[in-house]
Amino acid sequence: MSATLNDDSPIVENFDANPDDIKKPISAKTVAGIGERMIIIPKITKIDNPDEAVEKLVTNFRNNKFGIVILVPSGSAANRWKKVNATYAETSEQVDEYVKSLIERKSYGPYVFANRYDGIDLPSDSCRILIVDGLPKQSGEYEKYASKVLTGSSFLSSVISVRIEQGIGRATRGRGNYSVVILTGESLAAWIAIHYDSMTVGTKSQIKIAFDTTKEIGTTNDLINMVNQCLNRDQNWVNYHAQELAKLTDLPPPEIKKIDIADTMRKAFNFADNKQYDKAIAKLNSITSSDVDNNIKGIAWEFKARFAYFWGNAQDSEKYQKDAYELNNNLLRPKTPPPYQRIPTKSKQAELVCQKVLKYQFRRGLIEDFEGVIANLNPKVSSNSFEQSLKDLASFIGIESDRPEQKRNGGPDVLWVFPENKALVMEVKSLKKPDNAFVKRDFGQLLVSMQWFKENYPEFQALPVSVHSNNKAEAKLSIDNVYVLTLNSLNSLVSEIKAFLIEVCRDELSSADLIVTCEGSLKSHGLLYKHIEKKYIRKFEKA
């Protein structure tokens, strides 16, 4: 059993439960009986340095006999909290020891526990301030697999939501209990902003209550004063929280579509387990032929490929795997990849930016998402991480992008396609030493990528661009039609994009005002193709 199961479909898929029963759950009429949590997300307030503010808050309250616990995803993430003299529990025995000490009121922390989102209870005074720092990591091989192949899917959102809500619930164990829960770390704030709807009704309500009451917080003192309202039992806060929760009488119905998909998967697995592979494949047809998320549909095709292989039909197996890979490039690559699918280029940049902004429940969460992306745009990370971040960067200014080489062993590392039939064909050399020049091999790769581009986008004009540490090329190269985006120029572009996002992510902008603001800001910040080409892309010079 779990108090935070916000998606019932795994009960069907994992335990072969009767789907008709799962569609008619016994549930409470309201969420008014859950514990009181003041959930604060400093990253979506107006505080200039949210991380520093949270650290000062811990220092302020550590001697006030309020139990303080910090949950982090890993041991390495605990290092941050050394500066506030928090005690890290390195072993399970230490976790038990520190939890017992908190419950018996022999100590007040702050204690740091790694990957302890469930399995510990910290009721009443044992923990009045709970800090969840960073996005929980996958626990177990299946979740690690799912995080890779189901990126962005509702299934993965549900898995992470459960982990977050389990963590949030460590300090509030029932009705009549109360605590302050601070959600910090760029990845966590951004994730909640975009996946808000995947959380349970009670948690969503408490996050919204906190957002409405804390969005104007601008200083550390404001944050401390807000926390004191909960800890000192300020009646205005207590009554407001209770009234807002009491309004939630319409709980969401079960997600019938998810349950039906889970039931189909379970029945297909049962057939396969009995070596009835033909029936297993036939069962999955209802998913592969339906209008469902491409990630889920891709997995169904991949299972069909496996079942066909076990059945001795290698030809169908290869065909099914091609269909799977075409829908979800994170799945196994078939022996012969399917033809390249061009990325769409019909929408205007401003329209795509608006669509992205409106996906976030709290618009400032988009900026935290952006910060997470640009963290990998430095020469110290792997080339794969750098290329993925360069691809993702495009979406923040409404540019369609792709990684053709990663998908099909052909084409450029990164492709940015603009709505005016223009493109940047990019080969990334982020791991080169700062003084290394652009050489013949690099030149050859760009030429091959440009040939690929002309074959797949014949009506487009493109610039061959090397993302390189400097703008120096070997003297013997003919570099008249080859361009460079230096790491310094990339950093300048990133800074301009951030300034643009701060402008368009204001919560007071209506949807109609947002599109107008996006159009104007893209021009004023120089983020259209003609601006980027002129300001950030330059020609190589002879070394």
Region spans (language model):
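Conserved RecA-like helicase motor-core motifs
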Residues: 19-26, 67, 82-99, 400-404, ...
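Interdomain hinge/linker at the junction between the two RecA-like core domains of SF2 helicases
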Residues: 1-60, 213
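Conserved helicase motor
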Residues: 72-76, 88-102, 113-118
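Interdomain/boundary linker segments immediately adjacent to catalytic/signaling cores
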Residues: 321-324, 328-381
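Conserved strand-helix element at the start of the C-terminal RecA-like helicase core
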Residues: 60-84
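Catalytic core segments in nucleotide and nucleic-acid processing enzymes
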Residues: 94-98, 104-106, 132-134, 158, ...
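Conserved RecA-like P-loop NTPase helicase motor core
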Residues: 101-191, 432, 454
